[in-house]
């Protein structure tokens, strides 16, 4: 039904945020009301988010922590390589992307960061297995570089190491930040708590596939990358309690939404209620998808033709999102990972909204 071109738009390059603002909650927030015709918008500061949420509503955060997953290195022959660790698979093993003039075969030794050697193991398309000489996480955090998105043009510095990480990051494993969470700081949490807004966390380790472009015009043919996630029982209980009192579940970021909806979809398919789970998901949310859990979404502005733009269009309505993005561009909002945020409400008729 939909093609890639349906999710394209022209973005002035100067609106791509290259650095984070000095204060997390100083970013802007576009509150979108898709229930009106046409959609209406409120231009806010992110610090005003607590005013947009009701007591008893539940905010769901992704507590993944970004790894220093990028390495420059070389082969024994001297050939230069670049490694991006995608996923930790054991204490001393990981899956990684490797950029090299020639694909390394099993047994190839690579020198990373001029500090330690790894050995290439079996190929697990599109990744390579890497065997580390010691604890992966320790070596990655000591010698790796922060994997900033490809559209950010500067090398990571100490400011990025703080600001490309949420203040509540707990579980190391992501190679990209759950960026909607970057706007939250202690002052916002204090005001949310004072208002009686509930908070809970899940974990989804964001993979590098989040930046992979869609290369097929028929989006139904797109092959979605897979990511690991975990929903704890405490979150399942909080969602049930939120529903019981008539409040709303608000996902902070598309990664939180994907984890919640993947778990609910799989539970539905098995004829069971939502339950605690730890699993892989390659859920691909496009217009026409039936949302089961999430009522509202805090999210940043996404790339043209991206799967995340398709997701927000499925959630809030295609025309609503198009209008919101036009409003944001005209209003000089900042886009992508270090950019501003929007607050969306689920449309019951997203195909026509």
Curated annotation (Swiss-Prot):
Gene3D superfamilies: QueA-like
SUPFAM superfamilies: QueA-like (SSF111337)
Classification via InterPro entries: QueA, QueA_dom1, QueA_dom2, QueA_sf
Record-linked Pfam families: Queuosine_synth (PF02547)
Catalysed reaction equations from the record: 7-aminomethyl-7-carbaguanosine(34) in tRNA + S-adenosyl-L-methionine = epoxyqueuosine(34) in tRNA + adenine + L-methionine + 2 H(+)
Keywords from the named record: Cytoplasm, Queuosine biosynthesis, S-adenosyl-L-methionine, Transferase
Signal peptide (from-to): none
Subcellular location: Cytoplasm
Enzyme Commission code: 2.4.99.17
Record bears the keyword Iron: no
Protein's pathway: tRNA modification; tRNA-queuosine biosynthesis
Molecular function in Gene Ontology: S-adenosylmethionine:tRNA ribosyltransferase-isomerase activity
Root EC class: transferase
Biological process annotations from GO: queuosine biosynthetic process; tRNA wobble guanine modification
A Gene Ontology term for the protein's cellular component: cytoplasm
Record bears the keyword ATP-binding: no
Protein's job: Transfers and isomerizes the ribose moiety from AdoMet to the 7-aminomethyl group of 7-deazaguanine (preQ1-tRNA) to give epoxyqueuosine (oQ-tRNA).
Subunit annotation: Monomer.
PANTHER family with a match to the protein in the record: S-ADENOSYLMETHIONINE:TRNA RIBOSYLTRANSFERASE-ISOMERASE
Similarity comment: Belongs to the QueA family.
Protein name: S-adenosylmethionine:tRNA ribosyltransferase-isomerase
């Amino acid at each position: 039904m939909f093609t890639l071109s349906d999710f394209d738009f022209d973005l002035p390059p100067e609106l791509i945020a290259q650095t984070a603002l000095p204060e997390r909650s100083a970013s802007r927030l576009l509150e979108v009301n898709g229930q009106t015709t046409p959609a209406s918008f409120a231009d806010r500061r992110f610090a005003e988010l607590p005013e947009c949420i009701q007591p008893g509503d539940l905010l769901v955060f992704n507590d993944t922590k970004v790894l220093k997953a990028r390495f420059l290195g070389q082969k024994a022959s001297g050939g230069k390589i670049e490694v991006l660790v995608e996923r930790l698979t054991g204490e001393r093993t990981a899956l990684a992307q490797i950029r090299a003039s020639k694909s390394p075969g099993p047994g190839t030794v690579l020198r990373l960061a001029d500090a330690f050697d790894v050995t290439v193991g079996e190929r697990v398309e599109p990744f390579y297995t890497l065997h580390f000489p010691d604890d992966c996480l320790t070596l990655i955090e000591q010698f790796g570089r922060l994997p900033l998105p490809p559209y950010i043009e500067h090398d990571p510095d100490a400011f990025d190491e703080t600001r490309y990480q949420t203040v509540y990051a707990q579980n190391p494993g992501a190679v990209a930040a759950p960026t909607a969470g970057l706007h939250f700081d202690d002052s916002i949490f204090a005001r949310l708590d004072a208002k009686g807004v509930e908070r809970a966390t899940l974990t989804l380790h964001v993979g590098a596939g989040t930046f992979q472009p869609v290369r097929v015009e028929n989006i139904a043919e797109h092959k979605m990358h897979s990511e690991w996630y975990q929903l704890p029982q405490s979150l399942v209980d909080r969602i049930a309690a939120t529903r019981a009192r008539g409040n709303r579940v608000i996902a902070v970021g598309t990664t939180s939404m994907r984890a919640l909806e993947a778990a609910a979809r799989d539970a539905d398919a098995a004829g069971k209620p939502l339950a605690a789970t730890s699993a892989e998901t390659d859920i691909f949310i496009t217009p026409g998808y039936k949302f089961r859990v999430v009522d509202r979404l805090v999210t940043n502005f996404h790339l043209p033709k991206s799967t995340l733009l398709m997701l927000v269009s499925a959630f809030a309505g295609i025309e609503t999102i198009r209008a919101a993005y036009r409003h944001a561009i005209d209003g000089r909002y900042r886009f992508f990972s270090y950019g501003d945020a929007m607050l969306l409400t689920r449309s019951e008729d997203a195909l026509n909204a």
